[in-house]
Amino acid sequence: MRHEIWNEIRQQAPLIHNITNTVVANFSANGLLAIGASPVMADAIEEVAEMTFVSDALVLNIGTLGTMTEATMIRAGQAANEAGCPIVLDPVGVGATSFRRDVVERIMRHVRVSVIRGNAGEIATLIGVDWAARGVDAGDGACEPRQLALEAAKRYGCVVAVTGKEDMVSDGHVVMEVRGGTKRMTETTGTGCLLSAVVGACLAVEKNALKATVTAMSGYAYCGELASERAEGPGDFPIHFLNALHQLTQYTIPTNRIEVSTS
């Protein structure tokens, strides 16, 4: 965890290109603005490569797949690879349908991603572990999140973050557990998707993907806890959460929230 990342985001205002789903676009954009990043939500296939070339990170989120989504994401992803731009993939609901699984497989075949961020059910699907996923929700399975993160990172050669009751991040060599968060984050749509965007912002200023991801998740969880203390319910939680993100540079996040283990 490198807390200075939050100050660097605010100083540099990195441009984060999001090809994301229609449910969360507004929340993700506001969350990025809250931490000092600059969001752009360009998803027309005619312009995504050009937009990616001028961006500092690319976030691909398959939440609401359309007929052109796959081609658009691959074109943007290849442009990012050419430009040396880090990529975050959020495989929302990948276990729900064969269509989603096939799309993610083809994206991964053509694009080198820096970080995959998903819930346990989504990551389990990617590595072929049986899991009772429910739509875009995590569902239940027998494999530990720690093992899911480690095996997925080894398979795809990138950092993998598994979020849920237990948050795990792995680069295929070490696994880092990030403690914290609140159940309220599951009662508001888009909190996971915004986390992926925040990981992208951290990657824009910190090229070590493991360090950037752990920092993003730790700060994000801490803001969730602060917002939960101030909110009366799911209606005003997003407001307090965005405020906490905006004030993140002022907080001292306890260092004992991270536990490291080797593979």
Curated annotation (Swiss-Prot):
<feature type="binding site">
    <location>
        <position position="117"/>
    </location>
    <ligand>
        <name>ATP</name>
    </ligand>
</feature>
<dbReference type="GO" id="GO:0008902">
    <property type="term" value="F:hydroxymethylpyrimidine kinase activity"/>
</dbReference>
<keyword id="KW-0479">Metal-binding</keyword>
<keyword id="KW-0418">Kinase</keyword>
<dbReference type="InterPro" id="IPR029056">
    <property type="entry name" value="Ribokinase-like"/>
</dbReference>
<keyword id="KW-0460">Magnesium</keyword>
<comment type="similarity">
    <text>Belongs to the Thz kinase family.</text>
</comment>
<keyword id="KW-0547">Nucleotide-binding</keyword>
<dbReference type="GO" id="GO:0009229">
    <property type="term" value="P:thiamine diphosphate biosynthetic process"/>
</dbReference>
<dbReference type="GO" id="GO:0000287">
    <property type="term" value="F:magnesium ion binding"/>
</dbReference>
<dbReference type="Pfam" id="PF02110">
    <property type="entry name" value="HK"/>
</dbReference>
<dbReference type="GO" id="GO:0005829">
    <property type="term" value="C:cytosol"/>
</dbReference>
<dbReference type="GO" id="GO:0004417">
    <property type="term" value="F:hydroxyethylthiazole kinase activity"/>
</dbReference>
<feature type="binding site">
    <location>
        <position position="190"/>
    </location>
    <ligand>
        <name>substrate</name>
    </ligand>
</feature>
<feature type="binding site">
    <location>
        <position position="41"/>
    </location>
    <ligand>
        <name>substrate</name>
    </ligand>
</feature>
<comment type="function">
    <text>Catalyzes the phosphorylation of the hydroxyl group of 4-methyl-5-beta-hydroxyethylthiazole (THZ).</text>
</comment>
<feature type="binding site">
    <location>
        <position position="163"/>
    </location>
    <ligand>
        <name>ATP</name>
    </ligand>
</feature>
<protein>
    <recommendedName>
        <fullName>Hydroxyethylthiazole kinase</fullName>
        <ecNumber>2.7.1.50</ecNumber>
    </recommendedName>
</protein>
<keyword id="KW-0067">ATP-binding</keyword>
<keyword id="KW-0808">Transferase</keyword>
<dbReference type="GO" id="GO:0005524">
    <property type="term" value="F:ATP binding"/>
</dbReference>
<keyword id="KW-0784">Thiamine biosynthesis</keyword>
<dbReference type="InterPro" id="IPR000417">
    <property type="entry name" value="Hyethyz_kinase"/>
</dbReference>
<dbReference type="GO" id="GO:0008972">
    <property type="term" value="F:phosphomethylpyrimidine kinase activity"/>
</dbReference>
<comment type="pathway">
    <text>Cofactor biosynthesis; thiamine diphosphate biosynthesis; 4-methyl-5-(2-phosphoethyl)-thiazole from 5-(2-hydroxyethyl)-4-methylthiazole: step 1/1.</text>
</comment>
<dbReference type="GO" id="GO:0009228">
    <property type="term" value="P:thiamine biosynthetic process"/>
</dbReference>
